[in-house]
Amino acid sequence: MNHPETKEKKWRIFGALPANIVSLGWVSLFTDMSSEMIYPLLPLILTSVVGAGTTFVGLVEGIAEATASLLKLFSGWFSDRLGKRKTLVVAGYTLSAMARPLRAATTAGWHLLLVGFLDRVGKGIRTSPRDALLSDSVRREETGKAFGFQRAMGHAGAVAGPLIAFFLLTFLTAD
């Protein structure tokens, strides 16, 4: 997958990073922003709104994260075999993006468990192929810059998400 001779010719944004890297950075920013808007509130929603116990909160998070971790192993191998990393990356991000709004419609703990599971399936499908795509999109000496940009955008989203949630809850709620 790594073709150094073609990497020189790929379209680059601002002459610094290939479009794949910049696009994945922006997607990471918005994905992490949306995740971190709800993530700090999820235990509160589970215990006070849905009425779940603290053990169930741990179960929800444990199942979700275990699912993502196990799928990363499979999706990395599968993207190597398939040779179409972008397809898996798009599928994973799409599944997560479709699952997240469903949290608003949940009325029971098992609903949140299922939606969290679907969200993390998306993460598990996309993460390894995304990282391989990042690596494939740049010359070897640029991999640090590519991963650094993508991670920085993701972390910026992780910081902005809770701040936006705080603003929305503070200024746009009646209580």
Can you say where each PLM-predicted feature lies in the sequence?
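Cytoplasmic helix-loop-helix junction between adjacent transmembrane helices
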Residues: V115-A156
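Helix-to-loop junctions at the C-terminal end of transmembrane segments
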Residues: L71-G83, L169
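Transmembrane alpha-helix termini and helix-breaking/packing motifs in multi-pass membrane transporters
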Residues: L44-V49, A160-D175
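Residue-level signature of mid-helix packing/kink "hotspots" within the transmembrane helices
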Residues: E65-L73, A158-V159
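Helix-loop junctions at membrane interfaces in 12-TM secondary transporters
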Residues: L102-V115
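Helix-loop boundary and gating motifs at the non-cytosolic
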Residues: K9-A68
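Structural signature of the two symmetry-related core transmembrane helices
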Residues: T87-P101
